[in-house]
Amino acid sequence: MKALITGASSGLGRDMATVLSEMGYDIIAVARREDKLKELQSELKTDVEIICCDVTDNDQCIKLAKRASEVDIFINNAGFGVFGNFDVTDLDTELRMLDTNVRALHILTKLVSNTFKERGYGHILNVASLAAFFPGPMFGAYYATKSYVLRISQAVAEELRQAKSSVKISVLCPGPVHTEFGDVANVNFGNGTEKATKHLVLTSMDVAKYAIRKMLKGKEIIIPGAIMKIAVFLRRILPDKTLAKIVYLIQSKKCIKK
């Protein structure tokens, strides 16, 4: 058994690699930071191949997708966010985020699902976010990218069902998680709202364990945490305008790092 994971150098990707390794899976760990990948390689018990790859490069993405024939599970985890009002966030950084969160995932999902379908089996796990269900003022472009991840995953999963394929696609939609995400997004999550939100933030390992368990059971939309499931339910009954105001109130309490 073998799994390939992008964004495997830290956080959720690293922990999912650890969980799968403990279950006996060999790992192909993909990220840009070779030093972090080597650390992971030295820690895991099963065989670990490391690939230094920038998924914003289309050619590297296409080359990476060719490894799908070797694996049972392909996890699209690479991604990051940009925090701040839309009129002041850096355009180049946002475009790089779109390339990472949307373009790369689109390429890999398309090519890997085709390989899996021709072969007759395989499971893709795309990492979205609870943000996929909501409008996201002060995090607008990031929220929009995760909506794309959710909807393309649902659409392709249904196409595979209609084709009577054994290939599965799951999409992980976690709420706040303790990872490097806040550092990359240049925001302190919890500042100003720490007392109200600290019990909502899950550990990366808890989310990784839950995600892998549910994925292997064939769950399509995976939402860790009871409170996060309630949030998605409320999203169904509240108008988007109201939700946008609520999200803005939450986001405006976050402190941009200096």
Regions found by a protein language model. Name each.
Residues 109, 145:
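Active-site helix of classical SDR
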Residues 23-39:
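Conserved glycine-rich Rossmann-like NAD(P)H-binding loop of the short-chain dehydrogenase/reductase
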Residues 159-226, 241:
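SDR active-site lid
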Residues 85-98:
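Substrate-binding pocket helix/loop in short-chain dehydrogenase/reductase
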Residues 9-10:
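Conserved glycine-rich cofactor-binding loop
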Residues 129:
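Residue(s) in the substrate-gating loop at a strand-loop-helix junction
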Residues 52-63, 91:
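The beta1-alpha1 cofactor-binding region of Rossmann-like NAD(H)/NADP(H)-dependent oxidoreductases
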